[in-house]
Curated annotation (Swiss-Prot):
It is found in: Fimbrium. This is Probable minor fimbrial subunit LpfD. InterPro entries: Adhesion_dom_fimbrial (IPR000259), Adhesion_dom_fimbrial_sf (IPR036937), Adhesion_dom_sf (IPR008966), Bact_Fimbrial_Adh_Pro (IPR050263). Residues 1-22 form the signal peptide. It comes from the Bacteria. GO terms for biological process: cell adhesion involved in single-species biofilm formation. Induction: Induced during the exponential growth phase.
């Protein structure tokens, strides 16, 4: 009898057919090939009105993407699932929330200068504002078979918000912004996204400030005996004087109220990071604004403002700034003799 019972049970195992799921453990859809499809969206947005280049400006639906690429997914359902229902879609943001909501759309931090809101097309006429859940994908139906659809990240709209004004381009590196999941129930979307959406490119404001032709950028300090630097750490060598640097700019599309700040970047002296490196460890150059404030290279908070004129045409205004440069001893030692020079790069930023 024991042998007969064992054979009977074995027969029950091999005789069972169809799909069964424990409890509610069914519903999530997965990519047909097991691999999430990645949509990459190129961003090239222009802002012709420079007055919009201020913190808080919202640029709704400025990019509409549609690449026509279908994705394939499969949704497994139990045999008891007789009445076909629309596939449900969930859109998850992969960015930190910024706290901004405009017209029911949530914005997320994209870069230091931009936030983004994403609106993904999930059927012919239905869009999901990321984040969303339990949205019906009306054209995506079927159970236990491969479903092919363009409405899973292949089209959508992007909106941007400016958090910090910028000059020229605000570059967006390749950034994952959203993932899409699908399910036949609203209880479980699984852990494997059907698709993802990444963006890269730039938002451009047609405004700039350029150095006027003929502006002198070389600053000669003259010749000094090595002894002039000795025991004068942080001070100019004996006989040295501050040299003026007068910079003039042509600025276009800089609207009233916008401030343009100047800062420095470049190699600095190892013993005094305030000083521009001059190729000699005992010598450096400090750059100051007209008020005497030292502009520390590579310090984003160490800035000074350009003096902007009023508009002299519809889009143009002049800008100028007076800086002072002075050589110093960075160690108090007598430097070795030679000819030395240094380079620093000027950057302009909107405020």
């Amino acid at each position: 009898m024991k042998a007969a019972i064992a054979l009977s049970l074995l027969g029950c195992v091999f005789g069972f057919s169809g799909k069964a799921f424990a409890g509610d453990a069914w519903g999530p859809c997965t990519p047909a090939d097991g691999t999430t499809y990645h949509y990459n969206v190129d961003v090239d947005v222009g802002i012709p009105d420079a007055a919009k280049n201020v913190a808080g400006t919202v640029l709704p639906d400025v990019l509409n993407w549609s690449n026509g690429q279908n994705v394939s997914l499969i949704c497994e359902c139990p045999d008891s699932y007789k009445n076909e229902k629309d596939t449900l879609v969930q859109g998850v943001s992969m960015l930190p929330p910024s706290g901004r909501t405009v017209d029911s759309m949530k914005y997320y931090t994209l870069t230091e200068e931009l936030e983004v809101a994403t609106n993904i097309r999930i059927s012919t006429s239905v869009y999901g504002f990321v984040p969303f859940k339990n949205q019906q994908a009306l054209q995506t139906t079927g159970c236990n078979k491969v479903i092919t659809t363009p409405y899973m990240g292949g089209a959508g709209l992007l909106s941007f918000a400016i958090t910090k004004p910028f000059i020229g381009d605000s570059v967006i590196p390749l950034t994952l912004i959203a993932e899409l999941y699908a399910s036949k129930t609203n209880k479980d979307y699984g852990t494997i996204p059907i698709s993802s959406v990444s963006i890269q490119g730039r938002v451009t404001v047609t405004q700039d400030c350029e150095i006027k032709p003929g502006t002198v950028l070389d600053v000669p300090f003259g010749e000094f005996p090595s002894s002039a630097f000795k025991n004068r750490q942080g001070q100019m060598p004996e006989g040295a004087t501050e040299q003026e640097i007068n910079l003039s700019f042509d600025c276009n599309n800089i609207s009233d109220g916008i401030k343009v700040a100047l800062r420095l970047e470049g190699a600095t002296n190892a013993d005094d990071p305030r000083a521009v490196d001059m190729g000699n460890p005992d010598i450096g150059v400090l750059v100051k604004d007209s008020s005497g404030k030292i502009l520390v290279p590579n310090d984003s908070s160490s800035t000074t403002l350009l003096n902007l004129s009023s508009l002299d045409s519809k889009t143009h205004r002049n800008a100028a700034i007076r800086l002072l440069a002075l050589p110093i001893s960075t160690t108090g030692k007598a430097p070795k003799g030679g000819t030395f020079e240094g380079v620093t790069t000027i950057y302009l930023e909107m405020e």
